[in-house]
Amino acid sequence: MTCNVAFIGLGVMGYPMAGYISKAGHNVSVFNRTTTKAEKWIYEHKGKMASTPKEAAEGADFIFTCVGNDEDLRQVTLGENGLFHSAKEGSIYVDNSTVSAEVSRELYNKAKEKGFAFLDAPISGGQSGAEGGILTVMVGGDEEAFKKAEPVIDCYSKKVKLIGQSGSGQLTKMMNQMCIAGVVQGLSEAINFGINAGLDIDKVMETISKGAAQSWQMENRYKTMVEDKFDYGFAVDWMRKDLKIVIEEAKRNGSPVPITEIVDEYYADVQKMGGNRWDSSSLIARLKKKK
């Protein structure tokens, strides 16, 4: 069934995600703060460009957002020209941003007051996952709204799962980022250790990747880490933003996260090296620098 869809936020993730929704045959209206991005998207895909989030959401059955942080999300939803001023009763709003569970719960309640549904649905898989339409989506919210939205979310994902009530999607994404941070630091230490020991890293990785040490990061990032190439994905600035959310939420629910806190400090070191836009595998750079 063809639906009217609004997509707000055409960054490295949102741009291809909106494209997959359009390719599936839905009528897509897009908004992006940088209008040239939206113009480029319109040139490449079927759809129309809106001048504000409010305009994009008018008449939409499903509204999607993919923006940078809590402040950006509040601006495109509750701001003067935010989508909450035009979202129609009975529509479903799916937020793919990685933000705090607190703001997700706030928007869930405000949407409910206005007669439409809200799902927090952060994504994992990076730029390559978005471009390949194979993202993993972790969702928080009401089951009825989820079942209606799932076919549209499927357009850009390989796995979508309703975790629980509002905020559960964001909490799951926090766990995801904690796991990635720890794995990348461990892999960085191991690669640096192997280099210093004079080992053939390709042979080592070919061997240990078939055992218990195997990970997505090992399979997809070890070669670029060895070569000091850090332009393949999720930027350090964004990882630090996510880890800040993790640490703040951990304080709220009483969970000690000592490794996450340490790795966050290591990412701060990478920023001081000028690596703000390097991808998250760049933790190895600070180890090589310490030689």
What is each residue range found by the language model?
Residues 1-65, 91, 96, 127:
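NAD(P)+-binding Rossmann beta1-loop-alpha1 motif at the extreme N-terminus of oxidoreductases
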Residues 132-133, 137-140, 165-197, 209-220, ...:
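Active-site-proximal catalytic alpha-helix in oxidoreductases
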Residues 28, 49, 118-119, 160, ...:
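Hydrophobic beta-strand scaffold residues
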